[in-house]
């Protein structure tokens, strides 16, 4: 916790029955826990940190998630909008800070009407591309009334409903080529990666047929 996310913590307190908030002693632990959650559940992990040094401490765990291709959304606080750019109270250029680790998507919510769209896109991109995304929320924006749905006017961005995961299906030609390669091998070893996720039984069957060892 910190004054950069007081508004978010207040909202989480009100939503305690819907959102499980786990407080840690160090922001780095929060990022590693979010990464671990993603690894063991297959769902998006989320971590929250205050502005300045708090946000910086997330980086180690977020790079672990990015390099292991795990979906994690980092939500960080920032100084009030009128203070940004003035080096006020440990202000850090968070867009630049997170631009590498969350290069697929890092955005600042400057108006409550943005919140639904930005949060939605952060989760969709993290899950679809199995990467890290980051949402930055100035502390004065956190205290404004929520806008449940953006206005229906020019320039407003709306989000969809639901999420359909993409499925990669190899062509018959690719399957036949792989089968031929495996059949011709004398000592076959299988090195599996993220592409074999949710296919444990299939991998076991292939390994049993070929008498192959499996490593990941």
Where are these regions (language model features)?
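N-terminal alpha/beta PP-like core and its mobile active-site loop of ThDP/TPP-dependent enzymes
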Residues: 1-216
